[in-house]
Swiss-Prot record:
GO cellular component labels: cytoplasmic stress granule
GO terms assigned for molecular function: ATP binding; ATP hydrolysis activity; RNA binding; RNA helicase activity; translation initiation factor activity
Motif, Q motif: chain positions: 40-68
EC number of this enzyme: 3.6.4.13
Protein name per its UniProtKB record: Eukaryotic initiation factor 4A-10
Domain of life: Eukaryota
Helicase ATP-binding domain span: 71-241
SMART domains assigned to the protein according to its UniProt record, in alphabetical order: DEXDc, HELICc
Coiled-coil regions listed: none
Positions of ATP binding: A84, Q85, S86, G87, T88, G89, K90, T91
PANTHER family: ATP-DEPENDENT RNA HELICASE DBP3 (PTHR47958)
Domain Helicase C-terminal per the UniProt entry, residue ranges: 252-413
Motif range (DEAD box): 189-192
Length: 413
């Protein structure tokens, strides 16, 4: 394997930019409409009183940049494509737009939200329920790994919103347990992941079963050209709220790399870091499930308290581990990219990429765990000789400079 560039490192920033320019260039401008109004407060958005109560009770005081621009066009029933960094309140943007438009006297599914992982779907369900607390909203998450019969029972009893993963949602539509007749809003969250090869066909299949007149919202942290191309098939004159790629760096997150010439040296480097730093909570990313188990065993054998989660574990175990991590009873979490999307862990101050991601776009989702909503955070990347190309690709992709880890790293945490 030595000398081989990691999978995904053939990323070509120039080609990406050319493709984006082609899609978003002036000759394509008629595909999009623009919406220039910015609302500095939630009160100014014309939202229902009980929705505002839910927003303030959830802890929002002032809308984030994406919320200032994105909530109102969605509330007006416009198709929207919105791009914003992880941790900027993207989920609350579309949840508010959905909750504002529901007819609460009609207990039928009126909004369908799709997410790539069950963890993210459950996270969205929680936010939707919390923001809609004073509206009496009925939300249900349809995700794999749970009882089909229970899903059917809840859907039969009536809900306003279904959040789910494509496989289970399509299954419920096919069984006619989820009736599409009243669905008027269709949201794709983390569209870059959803529209990647794995889910593309299922999303098309679901879309075919929905009413022809439907509002579509596409939300994502990164917006690769393929995602934009596919939205053309679904959307009608969408309002585009895009952050240029240069701006999609996570403000407040200091990013460093450590040279670890060989793979075998990473473990020593990691243990050294944990012995010298006072870390409140941290997430360590590796690229395979097997490596999660291996690294967890190695860290525990050196008396470091760590927990781990990956896709081979049953859902119940993953839920318990995530609960412990959220509550702070476990402080170090080792995981794969499964967790990199949408898990809202507020106290994370440090993210370590033990392995660099295999695709530049996943870097943003990973380091977005730290510094959410402007909290400061540190991301440290372990870089072997074989990783140098990928590190360079990431820096080009986000237009950032990732510096070598300084000796005084303890002062940054």
């Amino acid at each position: 394997m030595a000398g081989l560039a990691p999978e995904g490192s053939q990323f070509d920033a120039r080609q990406y930019d050319a493709k984006m320019t082609e899609l978003l260039g002036t000759e394509q401008e008629e595909f999009f409409t623009s919406y220039d109004e910015v609302y500095d407060s939630f009160d100014a958005m014309g939202l229902q009183e009980n929705l505002l109560r839910g927003i303030y009770a959830y802890g929002f005081e002032k809308p984030s940049a994406i919320q200032q621009r994105g909530i109102v066009p969605f509330c007006k029933g416009l198709d929207v494509i919105q791009q914003a960094q992880s941790g900027t309140g993207k989920t609350a943007t579309f949840c508010s737009g959905v909750l504002q438009q529901l007819d609460y006297s009609l207990v039928e599914c009126q909004a369908l939200v799709l997410a790539p992982t069950r963890e993210l779907a459950q996270q969205i369900e929680k936010v939707m329920r919390a923001l809609g607390d004073y509206l009496g909203v009925k939300v249900h998450a349809c995700v794999g790994g749970t009882s089909v019969r229970e899903d059917q029972r809840i859907l039969q009893s009536g809900v306003h919103v279904v959040v789910g993963t494509p496989g289970r949602v399509f299954d419920m539509l096919r069984r006619q347990s989820l009736r599409p007749d009243h669905i008027k809003m269709f949201v794709l969250d983390e569209a870059d992941e959803m529209l990647s090869r794995g889910f593309k066909d299922q999303i098309y299949d679901i879309f075919q079963l929905l009413p022809p007149k439907i509002q579509v919202g596409v939300f994502s942290a990164t917006m690769p050209p393929e995602a934009l191309e596919i939205t053309r098939k679904f959307m009608n004159k969408p309002v585009r709220i895009l952050v240029k790629r240069d701006d999609v760096t996570l403000e407040g997150i200091k990013q460093f790399y450590v040279n670890v010439d060989k793979e075998e040296w990473k473990l020593e480097t990691l243990c050294d870091l944990y012995e010298t730093l006072a870390i409140t909570q941290s997430v360590i990313f590796v690229n395979t499930r097997r490596k999660v188990d291996w690294l967890t065993d190695k860290m525990r054998s050196r008396d470091h308290t760590v927990s781990a989660t990956h896709g081979d574990m049953d859902q119940n175990t993953r839920d318990i581990i995530m609960r412990e991590f959220r509550s702070g009873s476990s402080r170090v979490l080792i995981t794969t990219d499964l967790l990199a999307r949408g898990i809202d862990v507020q106290q994370v101050s440090l993210v370590i990429n033990y392995d660099l991601p295999t695709q530049p776009e996943n870097y943003l989702h990973r380091i977005g765990r730290s510094g959410r909503f402007g909290r400061k955070g540190v991301a440290i990347n372990f870089v072997t000789k074989d990783d140098e190309r990928m590190l360079s690709d990431i820096q080009k992709f986000y237009n950032v400079v990732i510096e070598e880890l300084p000796a005084n790293v303890a002062d940054l945490l």
